[in-house]
């Protein structure tokens, strides 16, 4: 056991949720996607959920169409202005990409506290208890929010006893640290080794 290291980590945290926002319903009502036989068949704009956030994509055939961009933004700004809908913030493609999100999205949405997004189109909102998904908590919210962190702990061989890291670390720092612990050279990585934890 003297050559054993135990690592505990989480890749994300959970937030309590009780309301669901279906952005595709509003896009459908605005004529930005079409439904046939109960299924989305074509789209100019489409919302793809990430639980606590949501990507908005424009179809490649219209992604540079100023009118489609304007209509899509208007739908989203209208939803954001509603007390009874779950959009907290709308991010541009550049803002999303700078956080490491999909640079191919047109926009990205952040959910209000207690809300999350799903892809369905049949209704605009629902109480979580009325959804088949049955989620009481979910992840996918934007990083940096208060009380939205996870944990990382190591103990054992090659770990400094009693070491505490008081700075914020990212998942990619955990990966770089685990690679260093295993003496694996990952080359150039996004993360930095958390040296204060290692002997």
What are these regions (language model features)?
Residues 1-128, 133-134:
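Secreted, luminal/periplasmic, and some membrane-associated catalytic domains
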Residues 2, 148, 190:
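Residue-level signal for beta-strand positions within conserved beta-sheet cores that form or flank
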Residues 122-123, 166-168, 190-191:
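Composition- and surface-driven signal marking solvent-exposed, interaction-prone regions
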Residues 7, 178, 182-186:
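Short, hydrophobic alpha-helical segments
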Residues 29-66, 135-176, 180-181:
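Substrate-binding rim/cap in mid-to-C-terminal beta-strand-loop elements of soluble/periplasmic
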Residues 184-199:
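C-terminal beta-strand edge segments of enzyme domains
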């Amino acid at each position: 056991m003297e050559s054993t290291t135990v690592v505990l980590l989480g890749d994300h945290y959970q937030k309590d949720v009780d309301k669901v926002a279906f952005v595709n319903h509003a896009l459908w009502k605005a004529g930005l996607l079409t439904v046939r036989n109960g299924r989305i068949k074509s789209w100019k704009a489409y919302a793809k959920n990430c639980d606590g956030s949501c990507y908005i994509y424009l179809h490649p055939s219209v992604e540079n169409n100023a009118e489609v961009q304007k209509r899509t933004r208007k739908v989203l700004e209208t939803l954001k202005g509603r007390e009874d809908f779950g959009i907290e913030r709308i991010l541009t493609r550049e803002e999303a990409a700078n956080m490491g999100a999909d640079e191919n999205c047109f926009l990205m949405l952040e959910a209000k506290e207690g809300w999350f997004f799903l892809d369905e189109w049949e209704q605009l909102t629902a109480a979580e208890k009325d959804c088949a998904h049955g989620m009481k908590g979910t992840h996918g919210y934007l990083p940096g929010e208060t009380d939205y962190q996870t944990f990382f702990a190591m103990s054992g061989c090659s770990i400094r006893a009693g070491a505490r890291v008081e700075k914020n670390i990212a998942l990619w720092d955990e990966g770089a640290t685990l690679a260093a612990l295993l003496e694996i050279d990952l080359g150039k990585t996004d993360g930095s080794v958390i040296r204060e934890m290692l002997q």
